[in-house]
């Protein structure tokens, strides 16, 4: 579907706002962990699943979301996923114990995983090749700024409000996006029937879930933790073997045969791992061990968030002007 310039700008704004809200949500609970550990009487290893579980589900859902994009109309899929995010946020807002909160976080992650892939694919589809770097730079600004701003925003909010307000913020932000999409988002493409490899989805979810659960358990029960990690790796290996032999893989691992793609993938994984690890650990250390307030933690996290916001669009412009080698 051919869109005029004004429509493209409006659609891009809606997509970026949705992706930003989903990514902001990934680290929004980090600063709230000490408060929730106190309120629910739980350990750090259990509380961190509010963030780790969210990231895990996003990672597992993302490959499926590319197929969902092809199978359903863009408008229906976007409204469904943003609606799911709002419903999950409402569940977290009214919850009064840990397990409904965790369920809300995991449902938010399902919606976020779909929204993030949807936004990237749709942006590339409506963008001309000569503006690709700039648009991807804006998307990367959202990808990096969302998780970076999350702890800052939650730190400020928790200075005056309870952790319930974090879910309330998610409801309000995504409700605005949903309303804007109802009136402005066209069907960029028609739906078409394709098969989805659900067994591969289950293998990846079980494998990564067991591996991460093993890491969380190994300190308290070493034998159980190591066993879970080994079992998780076996499921992941089974998943990888299935992808190599499948004609329509859920995740096309054959791309890793390319040396450049392989190196860049490893680099992005390491960089994002360090980024998320730092975003998770620093608030817990400052609040639980150094006795700092949520607002003080927010101030510590602020410079990194600002740097991300500034650097990402500049990188996209440099890519358009000078190419990949300069970057």
Q: Can you say where each PLM-predicted feature lies in the sequence?
A:
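12-transmembrane solute porter fold
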Residues: 7-34, 40-66, 70, 75-78, ...
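Membrane-interface helix caps and helix-loop-helix hairpins in membrane proteins
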Residues: 98, 189-194, 215-222
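MFS-fold secondary transporters
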Residues: 88-93, 108, 124, 181
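Short, Lys/Arg-rich, polar N-terminal cytosolic tail immediately upstream
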Residues: 1-5
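Cytoplasmic helix-loop-helix junction between adjacent transmembrane helices
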Residues: 106-141
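C-terminal membrane-cytosol helix-exit motif in multi-pass small-molecule transporters
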Residues: 171-190, 205-217, 231-246
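Helix-loop junctions at membrane interfaces in 12-TM secondary transporters
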Residues: 94-105, 162
């Amino acid at each position: 579907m051919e869109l005029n310039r004004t429509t493209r700008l409006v659609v891009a704004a809606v997509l970026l706002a949705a992706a930003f809200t989903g990514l902001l949500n990934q680290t929004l609970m980090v600063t709230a962990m000490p408060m929730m550990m106190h309120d629910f009487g739980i350990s750090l290893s259990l509380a961190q699943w509010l963030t780790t579980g969210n990231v895990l589900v996003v990672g597992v859902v993302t490959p499926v979301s590319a197929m969902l994009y092809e199978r359903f109309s863009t408008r229906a899929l976007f409204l469904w996923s943003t609606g799911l995010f709002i419903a999950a946020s409402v569940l977290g807002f009214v919850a009064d114990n840990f397990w409904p909160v965790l369920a809300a976080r995991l449902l938010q992650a399902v919606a976020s995983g779909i929204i993030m892939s949807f936004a990237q694919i749709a942006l590339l589809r409506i963008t001309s090749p000569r503006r690709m770097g700039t648009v991807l730079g804006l998307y990367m600004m959202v990808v990096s700024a969302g998780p970076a701003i999350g702890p800052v925003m939650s730190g400020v909010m928790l200075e005056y409000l309870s952790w319930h307000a974090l879910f309330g913020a998610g409801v309000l932000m995504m409700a605005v996006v949903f309303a804007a999409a109802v009136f402005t988002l066209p069907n960029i493409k028609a739906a078409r029937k394709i098969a989805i490899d659900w067994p591969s989805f289950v293998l990846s979810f079980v494998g990564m879930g067991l591996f991460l659960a093993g890491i969380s358990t190994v300190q308290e029960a070493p034998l159980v933790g190591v066993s879970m990690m080994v079992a998780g790796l076996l499921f992941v290996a089974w998943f990888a073997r299935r992808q190599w032999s499948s004609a329509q893989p859920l995740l096309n691992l054959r791309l890793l045969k390319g040396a450049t793609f392989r190196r860049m993938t490893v680099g992005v994984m390491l960089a994002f791992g360090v980024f998320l690890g730092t975003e998770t650990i620093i608030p817990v250390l400052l609040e639980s061990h150094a006795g700092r307030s949520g607002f003080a933690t927010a101030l510590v996290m602020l410079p990194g968030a600002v740097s991300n916001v500034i650097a990402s669009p500049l990188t996209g412009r440099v890519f358009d002007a000078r190419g990949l080698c300069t970057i």
